[in-house]
């Protein structure tokens, strides 16, 4: 995988190596061509709020947005799968300031929240969505499976980014995330609405 990270946020404490690792792992598990390209943009609250309005017509900042480019179907390595060449998957945009507040409310650290959001964004790049309840359950289950498997993979490789979290907010269901969104909306921080 060719993954580039552009930190335009000025926010300290973002482990870019970890973001590349988790995205590469998730895309590999989804059988995306190993020469595919993607980028991660780390932005501030104002930038993501502008993108949120421009592309989703929703006011206020959010945690993650994805901008797919080439339409792909996971499974290039399956015997029955097509053999597409490398592709430009698209861009994942993360807002660590928003994610930090969300992580605190969910009961885990920023690094885990950014890893979770990176996996979430990668699934959006691959065409997954959470518009209806069935899609939402499927996407969040896959997100949690990929994230848990990544932690196991990291541990097996002897790499330490942060310990694998536990607790209700660590690997959230769609309902857990909805509850977190409601807490964020009710917060008086001025962050506005949430749409991930």
From Swiss-Prot:
Binds 1 zinc ion. Pfam families: YbeY (PF02130). Keywords: Cytoplasm, Endonuclease, Hydrolase, Metal-binding, Nuclease, Ribosome biogenesis, rRNA processing, Zinc. Its main location: cytoplasm. GO terms for cellular component: cytoplasm. GO terms for molecular function: metalloendopeptidase activity; RNA endonuclease activity; zinc ion binding. The keyword Nuclease applies. The keyword Cytoplasm applies. Zn(2+) binds at residues 120, 124, 130. Coiled coil: none annotated. One of its GO terms (biological process) is rRNA processing. Its cofactor is Zn(2+). Its EC number is 3.1.-.-. It comes from the Bacteria. It is found in: Cytoplasm. Gene3D superfamilies: Metalloproteases ('zincins'), catalytic domain (3.40.390.30). Belongs to the endoribonuclease YbeY family. PANTHER family: ENDORIBONUCLEASE YBEY, CHLOROPLASTIC. Single strand-specific metallo-endoribonuclease involved in late-stage 70S ribosome quality control and in maturation of the 3' terminus of the 16S rRNA. This is Endoribonuclease YbeY. The lineage of its organism: Bacteria, Bacillati, Actinomycetota, Actinomycetes, Mycobacteriales.
